[in-house]
């Protein structure tokens, strides 16, 4: 078994001799700042507990069973050459390490940013809800203040009805007054016409009588009769005196 693993490693090194030199400096470059930065290393117990917590399962037994099964499958795959450790495994491990670091260190930052955005949106929604509630309360207060509008409307309707009735009566009186004035005007004109007709008739009658008298006075017989009648009247007056 060991000879097979050795042959596989040698073959992989011959096929890809340039991968390991490129990967190892990268690993050394990544590892050197870690040890030279002076950051205190994490407690192994805490690290182990975080690894156990990251495993799927609801209790310690299930997580242990999953971890044991994964280790057994890995050993079985490596021992039967179902999977061979090569430079691709190193690259995959590096990628997984990078992604794990991003998730571990960037996750809290992203969670903080997401929480801030969520709080911001919640504050906006709460403010909008409060404004809407206040607007509704204000509207309800305005409507309550207008609760007496029905009585006022009824009173105004009664007043308008009475006003319409008075206007109708005033219009009727105005029409009657206008009709009476027109009738008076017609009657006055008729009276004036009759007066003018009577005056004309009287004038014509007087002219006719005067003309007739003047015509009779031109007759000598009539003048003689008038003179005799006048003398007789004078004698009667003298005899009575």
Curated annotation (Swiss-Prot):
UniProt-annotated location(s): Mitochondrion; Mitochondrion inner membrane
Keyword presence, Transmembrane helix: no
Q: How does it assemble?
A: F-type ATPases have 2 components, CF(1) - the catalytic core - and CF(0) - the membrane proton channel. In yeast, the dimeric form of ATP synthase consists of 17 polypeptides: alpha, beta, gamma, delta, epsilon, 4 (B), 5 (OSCP), 6 (A), 8, 9 (C), d, E (Tim11), f, g, h, i/j and k.
**UniProt organism field:** Neurospora crassa (strain ATCC 24698 / 74-OR23-1A / CBS 708.71 / DSM 1257 / FGSC 987)
What's in the GO CC field?
mitochondrial inner membrane; proton-transporting ATP synthase complex
Q: Which cysteines are joined by disulfide bonds?
A: none
Query: Which gene codes for it?
Result: atp-3
Instruction: Name a biological process GO annotation.
Output: proton motive force-driven ATP synthesis
Q: Which UniProt keywords apply?
A: CF(0), Hydrogen ion transport, Ion transport, Membrane, Mitochondrion, Mitochondrion inner membrane, Transit peptide, Transport
Q: Where is the transit peptide?
A: 1-35
| One MF annotation (Gene Ontology) recorded for this entry | proton-transporting ATPase activity, rotational mechanism
One Pfam family, short name: Mt_ATP-synt_B
Point out the signal peptide segment. none
Give the protein's recorded name.
ATP synthase subunit 4, mitochondrial
Family the UniProt entry places it in: Belongs to the eukaryotic ATPase B chain family.
Functionally, this protein is described as follows: Mitochondrial membrane ATP synthase (F(1)F(0) ATP synthase or Complex V) produces ATP from ADP in the presence of a proton gradient across the membrane which is generated by electron transport complexes of the respiratory chain. F-type ATPases consist of two structural domains, F(1) - containing the extramembraneous catalytic core, and F(0) - containing the membrane proton channel, linked together by a central stalk and a peripheral stalk. During catalysis, ATP synthesis in the catalytic domain of F(1) is coupled via a rotary mechanism of the central stalk subunits to proton translocation.
